[in-house]
Amino acid sequence: MIYLHIGGGVGDLDSSTNYRDGFSEFVKSKNDKNKKIFIVEANPANIKKLKRSWKNFKNVKIINIAITKNNVGKKIFYYSEKDAPHYQLFSSKKTCYETLSRFYN
């Protein structure tokens, strides 16, 4: 079985979600030794915790990229340090980021 999670965040290590993540819970509960897991996360600030979340699973590939409808090469993303340490607010559109970041002021 192949599992793909787009937008992995920090997996099940986010205290703001009570350390729960539906994808992580579902996949980790499956007793399938042949499963392959691909997790895509655009925010590099989340990768270290995401790797820690999946450290006991050998068939996991964590990919630090953003997925877009067009091949745009490098892209600037906006996030707020006030949203640390899990950075739920993350956008490629500055106007969207500015609107949402008001919740953290």
Please identify what each model-predicted range represents.
Residues M1-N105:
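Phosphate/nucleotide-binding beta-alpha loop and adjacent structural elements of enzyme active sites
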